[in-house]
Amino acid sequence: MRITNVIWLPDIVDKLAWKHRVATIEVEHVLAHPTRFKFAELGRHHGEDVYVVFGQTEAGRYLAVWFIYKFNQEALILSAREMDGKERNSYGKK
């Protein structure tokens, strides 16, 4: 999966900062150096589905990032947070 650009909505940036303590630069690093993409659900528009990517930031945090993969290869960020225990264990077994 090739991502050419990341789309940030102001409300999402705010939510990531106050609720999940995740910075935009961390999300962009995970998307630029993905370990595993996983289909999450069908999107509202045909061909624009929701995916989750699991990866590690430069600082060593393990993040799960949800995004809509757009037709033009852009990623519209929906959410991001630290991986939970089950995700972290699965990530370690890649």
Go through each PLM region and give its residues.
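Ribonuclease/tRNase effector modules and their secretory precursors
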Residues: M1-K94
